[in-house]
Design a protein with these regions (language model features):
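Non-catalytic, topology-defining segments of multipass membrane proteins
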Residues: 1-192, 196, 205, 213-233
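Acidic (Asp/Glu-rich) catalytic motifs at the cytosolic membrane interface
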Residues: 189-217, 267-268, 279-292
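C-terminal transmembrane module of eukaryotic multi-pass membrane proteins
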Residues: 223, 229-292
Length: 292
């Protein structure tokens, strides 16, 4: 699958896709309902491939790898460490897979890579003088830590009977609808907090940490200042105001925790084999890092 069929390189060697950057059809005006419906059910589209994948991972995380809700009624270091370990393994496997294939193995070299250069490994602007080490440190020590704090405290609050819990046998339709709406809520929440943290004082205080990555890699996705992580993972608080199921929290946090990896991969497409590649739709956000 040759790069030239999908884009071209400028005189500095930067890859520019032919595909135009655009908003999803559900976010355009005037409304385009037919286009929106086609996008929702197309591949790639609203549900596939990414969002149903994150829903599936979140459901497995709750129903198979998490203790029952009543176990969260008492806050303790053991519960927190279990949650932190579970989330760390998810991040290590998912982000690590992108990083290993694209940046360690360099399985497709710079084919479809926006910036022909590789991450900076000798710069004082990053912790430890390395972009990759800086990003991994912030991902786990701030990102996964704060993600796990939100998870443990919200589930503790729910276990104390402070929310209206649903019964799956009686509310399966509501349960499924809420899961399918998570991506919409995440997009809206991210848009709002992202506009907020680009307010100059907050940008200088917190968001500039993330934007040091002008040539991002997968680990850049969750490499943020702790203040930004608090804003970012606050998306899970919404479900305290609706009939509640713990899976809503886990799926939302998994979506927030994992989805930045492909969006910051630094490539337009990933080659599956010599003749097949798939679009990871990351060019718009790459331009945001490059120019803002």
């Amino acid at each position: 699958m040759k790069e030239k069929y999908f884009g071209e390189r400028d005189r500095k060697g930067h890859y520019i896709p032919k595909k135009r950057v655009s908003y999803p059809p559900i976010f355009i005006w005037p409304l385009a309902p037919i286009q929106a419906l086609k996008w929702i059910f197309s591949v790639p589209g609203y549900f596939l491939p990414w969002n149903l994948f994150y829903v599936g991972i979140g459901l497995v995380s709750w129903f198979i790898f998490s203790p029952p809700l009543e176990d969260y009624a008492e806050l303790g270091i053991t519960n927190f460490l279990l949650v932190f370990a579970k989330n760390s393994v998810l991040v290590l496997i998912y982000y690590g897979a992108f990083h290993y294939r694209l940046y360690m193995k360099r399985a497709q070299d710079i084919d479809f890579k926006f910036n022909p250069r590789w991450p900076i490994e000798n710069s004082k602007q990053f912790l430890f003088g390395s972009q990759t080490k800086d990003n991994i440190f912030l991902t786990f020590c701030s990102g996964v830590f704060i993600w796990s704090c939100f998870e443990i405290f919200i589930l503790w609050f729910a276990a104390k009977n402070n929310v209206k819990l649903i019964n799956l046998d009686e509310s399966m339709f509501y349960f499924v609808v809420m899961l399918l709406l998570i991506h919409l809520w995440r997009d809206l929440h991210f848009y709002l907090i992202h506009r907020l943290i680009h307010y100059e004082p907050l940008y200088k205080w917190a968001h500039k940490t993330h934007h040091r990555n002008i040539n991002p890699g997968p680990w850049s996705g969750l490499a943020m200042h702790p203040i930004e992580h608090i804003f970012y993972f606050s998306c899970a608080l919404l479900y305290l105001f609706f009939p509640f199921h713990p899976a809503f929290i886990i799926v939302t946090l998994v979506h927030a925790g994992l989805s930045p990896a492909p969006g910051h991969a630094g490539f337009e497409r990933i080659k599956a084999d010599g003749e097949t590649s798939f679009d990871i739709d990351s060019y718009a956000h790459y331009l945001h890092h490059k120019h803002f």
